[in-house]
Amino acid sequence: MIITWMEEFGVLFVKAFLSLLAIMNPFSSVPVVISLMNEYSKEEIRVIALKASVYAFFILTFFLISGDLLFRFMGITLPAFKVGGGILLFLIALNLVQGEVTKEKGKAHEIEAALRRDNIALIPLAMPLLAGPGSITTVLVLRGYLNTLEGKVALFCAIFLSSFTAFVVYSLSTFFYRVLGRTGINLITRISGILLLAISVQFVVDGLKNLLKH
């Protein structure tokens, strides 16, 4: 029984983690991170990266915990949200495949405002770069899919590991940019977009199936 539970947990965790990592895609934000923190020391960059990942973790965890309450309060059914969320993720994925990251990853005025406020860990690094509309939608839709105890735990662990991955990438942003270059980052972004396209289509298909049953 324990082995079966672990196998089920592992499958759910991998599905949730890959979905979240595809939409968060911290590698695509590396050029933005470098431009924001080019005058900071390595220690300061690590501190800011840690704060940004912690902020993103708590934002996404909040929506994981409060998902049912939000749906009831707004009068939204899960199938309807699957369709709407899937369409939103599909549009975001198209931008990723086409290499148009900045449209979803933060506007120029948000970056300038962050520099003026010296609060880049929260805006734009944590939100919208990591915990933007796409990530929040993914958490809410996955929450409906993984509607068991092991599913909820798997999604929580996926949020934690995705946030930790973002911390590592942001902390080593200069290294990754030097190793991967613009071409490598664009390639990772497009691969993430293709994966997200498949996930978003599945969300829409499942949502439509559930709606047509009623």
Curated annotation (Swiss-Prot):
Major location (coarse): membrane
Subcellular location: Cell membrane
Pfam families: MarC
Name under which the protein is recorded: UPF0056 membrane protein aq_540
Keyword annotations of the record: Cell membrane, Membrane, Transmembrane, Transmembrane helix
Keyword Transmembrane helix assigned: yes
Record-stated family: Belongs to the UPF0056 (MarC) family.
